[in-house]
Amino acid sequence: MFLITSRLASLVLCLAVGMLACMQVARAQSDDAVSIHGQVTYNWQKHDSFSDPRGAGTNSLTSSAGKMYTFTGTAFLGMRPWVDGELYFNPEVAQGVPFTGNLVGLGGFTNGEITRAAGTSPSLYRQRLFVRQTWNRGGGKETIEEGANQLSGSVDRNRVVLTAGNFSTLDVFDNNAYAKDPRTQFMNWGSWTYAAYDYAADSR
């Protein structure tokens, strides 16, 4: 069962206050100087009981009916601290419980968000913190649209971009429209962890 604990409520409130403060700063600056986005996702799943003639082993999915849930909330905050430079920070809060109470029993878990969760107590952590520097090299201009972890602006078609810090492999090397974000795309975590990478932890 999903419970809104006092600790979770406090974390969400602090996150909201921080975002509002950043929005006040954004109003005082140009449109492409600050970027603020947020996302909250709640995923609840269940399975009915099923026959298990051999009996459930230590690493098996229990045959009795079960349910699981995840809750995550993320702020996508960005700013332009200097010319052609960008700074991004993504604080995130997560909680959840998998089937059987641990991550066993399925070859590919049906909710990729469970990789972030650490039990019924919400955890606040730094999901991303990175800088991006662009060196324009001519060749005409093109417009970059504003979005989560992306400031709007005009850049040269020929450019060198350096990204450094804490971010996900999937942010750069697997930008597909189907299986890189369990919040909005296919949820099975095999699609973007061990089924796609030798070392699955690189995808977080």
List the predicted regions and their residue ranges:
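Surface-exposed strand-loop-strand hairpins of Gram-negative outer-membrane beta-barrel proteins
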Residues: K46-T70, N176-K180
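Outer-envelope beta-barrel architecture signal
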Residues: D32-I36, V83-F89, Y125-Q127, D156-V160
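Residues on the lipid-exposed face of transmembrane beta-strands in outer-membrane beta-barrel proteins
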Residues: G38, G73-M79, L129-Q133, A164
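Outer-membrane beta-barrel channels and translocator barrels
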Residues: D31, R80-D84, N136-G138, R157, ...
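Repeated loop/turn-to-beta-strand initiation elements of outer-membrane beta-barrel proteins
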Residues: D48, D84-L87, R137-E142
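Bacterial N-terminal signal peptides
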Residues: S10-C22
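Surface-exposed coil loops of outer-membrane beta-barrel proteins
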Residues: L103-F130, G138-R204
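Residue-level signature of outer-membrane beta-barrel architecture
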Residues: Y42, M79-P81, P91, Q133-W135, ...
